[in-house]
A protein has these predicted regions:
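Non-catalytic C-terminal accessory/binding modules of secreted extracellular proteins
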Residues: 24-38, 91-133, 137, 142, ...
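Glycine-centered tight-turn motifs at strand-turn-strand junctions
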Residues: 519, 529-546
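Residue-level detector of functionally pivotal "anchor" positions at catalytic/ligand-binding pockets or at interdomain
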Residues: 486-509
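The catalytic-center signature of Zn2+-dependent metalloproteases
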Residues: 255-325
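Short, glycine-anchored, charge-dense loop/turn motifs used at functional sites
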Residues: 523-529, 550
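Acidic, glycine-anchored loop motifs typical of Ca2+
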Residues: 187-199, 288, 294, 403
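Primarily auto-inhibitory N-terminal propeptides
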Residues: 23-102
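C-terminal tail/sorting-segment detector
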Residues: 21-22, 494, 547-563
Length: 563
């Protein structure tokens, strides 16, 4: 990565602050914070009480690992306010162009325009779907945010007053802008409040952000935070608003003057307001060591939006959510593997439907309910286009409530949410060897890493606990990853025995004898999936897709048939 950024994060580490204590503002990896960069929370500490209880058990439902109770289902609308300053205004020639651009960028549907540009000797391409597209796709259509574009509104003072190197007066900016909106009837902000709390109010401010190396230190650093409406005499207070969760992002990419910023920063910050913590090392008291740790001992790196993945394609096409992130926000369940056998795994971008044989993410539990393994399938397409490779991604979760709520999930070893790389290299910049199967060459020849076991390197391990299975024979056929799960315990429940499954061909149809609920997968000779059936009877007839040679797989049995 050729640049570094720091973005402050709204997280419940503040929930535990007591009156008068210094509360560190969180930021994205790669940028050293100024000394003494703290805010003092003056409110009654009770207001920072966790907004929900936290799940810790194996029976935790999807959504139980989120750190707040912000609504995350349905078609929801949020205010997006365009803010400029007397001495720094938007680069657009007229209001119509400005409003149209942000309407498309935040509310568009399938934006596919590609714009190439040169920046510091490199060629980049802006192919930016909308923010609404991003969250619709990550949630499989369960959550579709839309934004009411408001503005532009000109602040009362120059940009340096609000930035001043440490964003000293951004709270004042938020309250000032909200007051202006209410006073001038530009929008009904109180209509966005839930029990006095606006869950998400977004500011896009004119110009670039302080987050880019070499930027003006008086500009605002993109971040998310909470503003408390304390004064009873204000228009905002009288409208019934008591707290505002806000995020802010800049208009311009780096120091280009005219190239718009991507959506990666916004999606990262917005995800905090939805309930996700950061998955990089947030140890700002020892920033240089944290940077070194990210480089040499990264947790999720470019594979997660909440780590370095928001920078993919310079932020113009941020990485899609991981299976655990989708699970945390209630958009995906994790199928538990309880018996050994053969399994297929569809792309994480595919909407799961186990009844139809579409499996998007698997979970391997351990003896500790908060420690488990997740298996997902990545391809270099869509939001995952700028991933380092294709194949099975194996991640380990070691849930720690304090770490999640306090936003120090991966500050210490062992990491509490991390990828288990196929090449056993945990460095952030070596992500091309992270997925299974992994092929490499050395002086002895070509080798393929197609297994991950409880006794191998890396260990199939979450925290201090091991699952009861190891994984072998990982292969990728088209967009499908297949693998075998073998029990490490002789008493473990096994999959149907080979002799319990039979596959035969007669009159152009397959006859499959297998336990009810078995998955029958049919591939063409190149390995491309053709059909998938979940059996509803012990003996079931299944038509072949057409003439030719087909590969049929059910449980531990694979047959080649010709029609």
């Amino acid at each position: 990565m050729t640049f570094t950024r720091r973005i402050t994060a709204l997280l419940a580490c503040l929930m535990f602050a007591t009156s008068g204590q210094a509360v560190p503002i969180r930021s994205l990896p790669g940028q050293k914070l100024p000394d003494n960069y703290y805010r003092t929370e003056r409110d009654n500490p009770a207001v920072w009480a966790p907004e929900r209880s936290y799940a810790y058990t194996r029976g935790a439902a999807p959504g139980d690992y989120a750190i707040n109770d912000t609504p995350r289902k349905g078609n929801l609308t949020y205010p997006l306010i365009l803010v400029q300053f007397p001495d720094l205004q938007f680069s657009f020639n007229d209001r119509e162009s400005l409003m149209s651009y942000y309407e498309d960028l935040y509310n568009g549907n399938g934006c596919t325009d590609t714009v190439g540009f040169e920046f510091r000797g490199n060629r980049y391409y802006r192919t930016t779907p909308s923010v609404s597209d991003y969250f619709r796709d990550q949630s499989y259509g369960q959550y579709v945010p839309k934004f009411e574009i408001i503005g532009p509104i000109t602040a009362s003072r120059g940009y340096a007053y609000y930035g001043q190197g440490d964003d000293a007066n951004v709270e004042k900016l938020v309250l000032e802008i909200c007051d202006s909106i209410i006073t001038n009837n530009l929008a009904n902000l109180s209509g966005y409040a839930r029990n006095g709390m606006i869950d998400q109010l977004s500011l896009i401010y004119a110009g670039s952000g302080e987050n880019y190396d070499g930027s003006d230190p008086n500009t605002i650093w993109p971040h998310a935070d909470i503003v408390y409406v304390r004064s009873r005499d204000t228009t905002v207070y009288k409208s019934g608003i008591r707290r505002i969760k806000y995020s802010c992002s800049c208009e311009i990419f780096w120091d280009t003057d005219s190239i718009p910023d991507g959506i990666g920063t916004f999606c990262h910050e917005f995800s905090h307001t939805l309930g996700l913590p950061d998955f990089y090392n947030t140890d700002y008291n020892n920033r240089n060591e944290a940077d070194k740790d990210d480089e040499e001992n990264a947790a999720m790196g470019y594979w997660s939006l909440m780590d370095y993945g928001c920078y993919n394609n310079m932020g113009y096409l941020p990485v899609g959510y991981t299976a655990f992130e989708k699970y945390s926000l209630g958009w995906l369940d994790l199928e538990e593997i309880t018996y050994q056998g053969s399994y297929d795994l569809d792309l994480i971008s595919t909407a799961p439907n186990p009844q139809a044989g579409i499996h998007t993410a698997y979970r391997l539990s351990t003896g500790d309910d908060g420690q488990f393994i997740i298996l997902e399938n990545r391809n270099r397409s869509g939001w995952y286009r700028y991933n380092g490779g294709k194949g099975m991604m194996v991640t380990a979760v070691d849930y720690n409530q304090d770490g999640w709520v306090g936003n120090y999930v991966n500050n210490y070893n062992p990491k509490h949410y991390r990828i288990l790389p196929a090449d056993n290299n945990y460095g952030r910049e070596t992500h091309k060897g992270d997925l299974f199967p992994y092929q490499y060459s050395d002086s002895t020849g070509v080798h393929v890493v197609d297994s991950i076991t409880t006794k191998g390197q890396p260990e199939l391990k979450a925290g201090t606990s091991y699952p009861s299975f190891s994984i072998y024979n990982i292969t990728r056929n088209g967009d499908i990853v297949s693998f075998d799960v073998v029990s490490d315990l002789p008493t473990r429940i096994s999959s149907p025995k080979q002799e319990e499954i039979s596959i035969s061909l007669s009159d152009g149809e397959l006859t499959v004898s297998a336990p009810r609920g078995s998955t029958v997968s049919i591939y063409d000779i190149s390995g491309k999936p053709a059909s998938r059936t979940v059996t509803s009877a012990p003996v079931q007839k299944i038509p072949l897709p057409g003439s030719g040679i087909w590969i049929v797989k059910c449980g531990n049995i694979t047959r080649k048939v010709r029609l």
